[in-house]
Design a protein with these regions (language model features):
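Oligomerization/assembly interface segments of phage tail-like spikes and tubes
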Residues: 65-81, 127-138
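Acidic-leaning, charged glycine-interspersed low-complexity segments
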Residues: 21, 94-142
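Short, cysteine-centered beta-strand-loop-beta hairpins and adjacent loop/turn segments enriched
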Residues: 57-60, 78-83, 138-142
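Small/polar-rich, solvent-exposed N-terminal microdomains that initiate assembly or binding
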Residues: 1-63, 100
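Extracellular/virion structural assembly segments
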Residues: 67-70, 78-98
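N-terminal short leaders/motifs
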Residues: 20-30, 76-88
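Short, solvent-exposed beta-strand/turn "edge" segments of beta-rich domains on protein surfaces
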Residues: 61-67, 121-124
Length: 142
């Protein structure tokens, strides 16, 4: 039986394994699950936290032998540097997601960006985007 992988670990793994620091001013952010990163001083480094926002599970598709899971995972990017550096980080995340949107060697069927929110501090002390991704995967039921 194929088991649906953890969606948050899937996204953090993709970011860590495919990040090209040359696209972000030769800097690689700290990337991790929100529960692994814990409290981190956002004023000192680039940071990407990933966490699950919601998920659904449809049981019994295709003659009751296939389950489909759909999750929304947030990719929370922040930097104290500048808005242009944040845009570079955002561009790199999108590049990776487009590269891996449909990957036959992955634990998911489809990964796509859904929405983005600008949560930049109004005093411009730190710059932040939250990008929501939708991840779909299937599990074979025996």
């Amino acid at each position: 039986m194929a088991v649906i992988a953890d969606p948050v670990s899937t996204v953090t793994g993709l970011l860590n394994d495919n990040w090209v620091s040359g696209n972000t001013d030769s800097r690689t952010p700290k990337v991790g699950d929100s529960w692994d990163i814990g409290k981190t001083n956002m004023m000192k480094k680039d940071l990407i936290k990933c966490y699950e926002v919601s998920g659904t599970h449809e049981v019994g598709l295709v003659g009751k032998t296939l389950d489909r899971g759909t999750w929304r995972v947030s990719v929370d990017m922040s930097t104290p540097t500048s808005r242009s550096h944040l845009r570079n980080m955002y561009g790199e995340v999108l590049r990776i997601m487009r590269l891996k949107e449909v990957d036959p060697n992955s634990s998911y069927q489809l990964l796509r960006p859904v929405s983005r929110v600008d949560n930049t501090d109004k005093n411009k002390r730190w710059f932040r985007y939250v990008l929501d991704l939708e991840l779909t995967s299937y599990e074979v039921i025996s």
